[in-house]
Every structure is written in C-alpha cells, then in structure tokens.
UniProtKB/Swiss-Prot annotation:
Pfam families referenced in this protein's UniProt entry, alphabetically: SRP54, SRP54_N, SRP_SPB
Reactions listed under catalytic activity: GTP + H2O = GDP + phosphate + H(+)
UniProt activity-regulation remark: The SRP-FtsY complex formation results in mutual stimulation of their GTP hydrolysis activity.
Protein name: Signal recognition particle protein
SUPFAM superfamilies membership: P-loop containing nucleoside triphosphate hydrolases, Signal peptide-binding domain
Record text on subunit structure and interactions: Part of the signal recognition particle protein translocation system, which is composed of SRP and FtsY. SRP is a ribonucleoprotein composed of Ffh and a 4.5S RNA molecule. Can interact with FtsY in the absence of 4.5S RNA.
Composition skew (Basic residues), residue ranges: 447-467
The UniProt record lists the keyword Zinc: no
Residue sites binding GTP per the record: 107-114, 196-200, 254-257
Length: 525
C-alpha cells in the first residue's frame, strides 16, 4: 500500500535530518521531491499544487525557524497536511434514528462493489447488527449469484427475487427490487439494508439515470461511491461525475493492496469534499476496515500504524490468557503449548508480513519483510502438534528418538525439529530477561527470587550482603511479535530480522507513555 510513494517521501525528508537550520534552498529542494513523488503516484495536479503551497508557507514560518529541530518540524507539517487532504478526522457510518439504515453502493463495473457489500455486511454483523443484502445488479451475468455466495460467506441473508441477467430470464427492474428489499427488511426487522447496484465500464447517462432512480426509490441514509484505487487519474473524473449525477455521502476505496501508485486516495477527498469511510486491502472478508486519515498518513511517511496493530490484537487475544502468558514468560516457564496458542492468535490478525509492516521503520527493511512466508508457520504448527502433551509442557524431555518420531509424524526433517526446540529455549530465556529488565510488576521475579537466596558467584562463594554480583551478559532483543518467541529464528524461510533499524524496539513518538495494561482485550468466554 503506497510503497513507492512512501519510499519517495521518506527519501525526500531524510535529506533534512541533521540540519540545525533550514534555508529556502533546502525547503525548495525538499518540496520539489515531494511534488514529484505525488505526481508519480497519480495524485491530481490541483491537489499537489495546493499541498506544496501549504507546506512551503508553513515551512518558512515561525513554527519551523524557532523549533529546536527544524527538520523534524517539517516532517510534522507534511504529516499534518497529509492528514488534512485525506479527510482530517475519521468518519464512521451514519445510522438512521429509526431502523432500517439504508446503505446504497454505486460505482463503475469492476470496482469491487459486490465484494465490498459482503465485507461491510460481515463487519456490521460482527458489531451486533442484522444486515440484509439486496441484489439490484440485474445486468451483469452471475452478479446476483456472486452476491449470494459472498452473503453466505459473511453469514448474511440476501434478498434476490430476480435471478439477474441470463438468456432464460428477461430484464429485471432494479428499482422495484430495491423497493421490495426495503419492505422485506422492515417486515423482518433487519436494521441495516445494503443495496448492491449495477456498474458500467464507463460513465453514461443510462448508468446515472438508473442509480438516481434507485436512490429516489429507497432514500438511502448513506450512498457510498466504491472507487478502485488502481485507476489513477481517472478517479477524480469518475468521482466528480458520480457526485453530479447521483450524489454520494462517502467513499469506499478498494484494491489498496495492489501494486498501483494509489494517488486516488489522496485526490478524491480533496476534490469532492466527501470523506473516505472505508478501505479494502484484500480479497478476504476481514481485509476491510474504517479509513483513518491520521494512521494512513503515518504509514505513508514510514512511521507505522501501531494503533491499528493494537486494535487487531485486542480482537483476537484473550485478556486472561495474555496475562498468564506474560507471567510465564517472565518466570521462564513458557511452554510450547502456550507458544502454539499465541501463534494461532497472531495468525488470526492477518499475514505476518502485513503485521510487521505496521511497525515504525518497517519501510527500511522491505527486503526482509518480503521473505516472510506464512507457510513456515504451518510447518512450526505441525511440529508442535506432533508432540505429546507432556513434550509440549516440558520440551527438555524431547530426546533423539522423540525428535525422530515428531519429524516423521509432522512431515519435516529432524533438523527442523532440533532448530525449533533449541530456538524456543533461547527465545524463552531472552524474553524472560527482557520482561524482568523492564521492571514490570509481578513479572520476572519468580525466577529471580529462586536464586536470590544463597546465590554464588563464579568463585563458588556467597556474595556479600550489599555488594553487586557478577554482571549478567547482555542479551540482544529478539525482533518478533509479542507472545511469539523467536519469530526471527524459526526454521527455514523466515528472514533474520536482527539487523533492524534503530528505534524499532521502542514505541514511536506520542506513544512513549502508552500504558499497555489499559488495553481492552475481550474477556474469556
């Protein structure tokens, strides 16, 4: 997502660092690079001009000249202006005071309306709503069938009285279907109605007339314009045409996971004045989220998206299990069973590469992230599942014959089993040292108190009271996901992330005082 734009902007701002004072020439050179980066990303020219003008004005003002770190202040200005053109504040879906809330989807053919309808329905269902999908795309062959398949995957009913375009059936009336779907929702007490309409390969009067007729028939609370982020400069033209012909209250961006330059996201909000509500980043139903302008700007500038990562963790981790795992890690008692549970929870959050990409500075290690293969985690999972409960609880009992049995049972080599067991012990020791060194209450003290009484130094004599014992060797922090020890060293295929950029083991600015104990994890069911 925005990889090329992120690389160009990061490189442009990197040249300012280390300078105690910025000259007009420095500002001009930096804004020139930013301008080229935005234009290459297919951002609309008027948007680029206004964006660069605002940055220059602020960069030459008092807020930069009087700052202790002028370069960092310019980065802050660019971040704030990016947030501004992306919409400023997060805008949620507006629900009607009296159900049902009617959401109409409009857009060009192939923009992803039908799939997005299922994603939105699945999200609303997860929030406790009872959505109904209405199939009003009666012109594209198999469009109704596609919506029924998507609705079944999302666990949401589909209202489709007409089979859609086919040689056997005549043309249907999408306006009548939309009105009947709304009546069906009221009769059966659905609180949200999502209407999937037909698209075209281009803007034409027939498309506009049909969409406007459906809008007038159902009087929707929200009209979402579904925009393909890969269409480049045409995004502005298409959005403006739909705005004049039909009118819409929000934008949903699709295909943000593609390799396109993605300038549509930076243009459509500024040109139309309509907020971006949702962003779709994949084909799965869960690859869909509310669009946060501040987080998107942070990711574009290579500063990561820690808050989204935390929110995803809150959805999959159980509070009690997380506390128990943290206590076991601190005491050096983490088992392979605990490790397996944590790994399965992390995998529910999405591909590991995507999760690591949300960390600050991840853009500097793209090559390493590109090597991350989730299939290697399947092999690790198979190895652990091939062990007996006793072996998972106490890996020390896994001798040579047991390792051979585990390898044969899980379809891997003995060396892979050896690597997993050995690196599990190393990671458990490292994580115990890390948590103990952080001074977290109740963590890391159990194992420490065991050795506090009668502790002996290298000479075999007891340490004198009040004197320091031998300094323990420094242990390098493993780079991995919380609760997943030794991710960097799992067998075969996973990259060595030990050479991570400076600062990745720290929270980014603004989150330094973040209290992890206040995270709201779902309770144990």
């Amino acid at each position: 997502m925005f990889e090329s734009l992120s690389d160009r902007l990061t490189a442009a701002l990197q040249g300012l660092r280390g300078k105690g004072r910025l000259t007009d020439a420095d500002i001009d050179a930096t804004t020139r690079e930013i301008r080229l980066a935005l234009l290459e990303a297919d951002v609309s020219l008027p948007v680029v001009r206004a964006f660069i003008h605002r940055i220059k004005e602020r960069a030459r003002g008092a807020e930069v000249s009087s700052a202790l770190n002028p370069a960092q202040q310019v980065v802050k200005i660019v971040n704030e202006e990016l947030i501004s053109i992306l919409g400023g504040e997060t805008r949620e879906l507006a629900f009607a005071k009296t159900p049902p809330t009617v959401v109409m989807l409009a857009g060009l053919q192939g923009s992803g309306k039908t799939t997005l309808a299922g994603k939105l329905a699945a999200r609303l269902r997860g929030q406790g709503h009872t959505p109904l999908l209405v199939a009003c795309d009666l012109q594209r062959p198999a469009a109704v069938n596609q919506l029924q398949v998507v609705g079944e995957r999302a666990g949401v009913p589909v209202f489709a009285p007409h089979p859609g375009a086919s040689p056997e059936s005549g043309p249907g009336d999408p306006v009548a279907v939309a009105a009947a779907g709304l009546a069906e929702a009221r009769a059966k007490h659905f609180d949200v109605v999502i209407v999937d309409t037909a698209g075209r390969l281009g803007i034409d009067e027939e498309l506009m007339a049909q969409a406007a007729a459906i809008r007038d028939a159902i009087n929707p609370d929200e009209v979402l314009f579904v925009l393909d982020a890969m269409i480049g400069q045409d995004a502005v033209t298409t959005a403006a045409a739909f705005g004049e012909g039909v009118g819409f209250t929000g934008v949903a961006l699709t295909k943000l996971d593609g390799d396109a330059r993605g300038g549509a996201a930076l243009s459509v909000r500024e040109v139309t004045g309509v907020p971006i509500l949702f962003a779709s980043t994949g084909e799965k139903l869960e690859d869909f989220d509310v669009f946060h302008p501040d987080r998107m700007a942070s990711r574009i500038l290579g500063m990561g998206d820690v808050l989204s990562l935390i929110e995803q963790a809150e959805q999959v981790f159980d509070a009690q299990q997380a506390e128990e795992a943290a206590a076991k890690i601190g005491a050096g008692e983490l088992t392979l069973e605990d490790f397996l549970e944590q790994m399965l929870a992390v995998r529910k959050m999405g591909p590991i590469g995507n999760l690591l990409g949300m960390l600050p500075g991840a853009a500097q290690m793209k090559d390493a992230l590109a090597e991350v293969d989730d299939k290697q985690l399947d092999r690790v999972q198979a190895i652990i599942r091939g062990m007996t409960p006793q072996e998972r609880a106490d890996p020390k009992i896994i001798n040579a014959s047991r390792r051979l049995r585990i390898a044969n049972g899980s379809g891997v080599t003995v060396s892979e089993v050896n690597q997993l067991v050995e690196r599990f012990f190393e990671a458990r020791k490292m994580m115990s040292s890390m948590l103990g060194g952080m001074g977290i209450p109740g963590i890391g003290r159990k194992s420490a108190t065991r050795k506090s009484k009668g502790a002996k130094g290298k000479s075999g004599k007891k340490s004198k009271k009040g004197t320091r014992g031998p300094t323990p060797p420094k242990v390098k922090s493993p780079f991995g996901v919380p609760g997943m020890p030794g991710l960097a060293g799992l067998p075969g295929g996973l990259p060595d992330l030990s050479q991570m950029p400076k600062g990745l083991d720290e929270l980014p600015p603004g989150l330094a005082d973040f209290d992890l104990s206040k995270l709201k994890f779902p309770g144990k069911k």
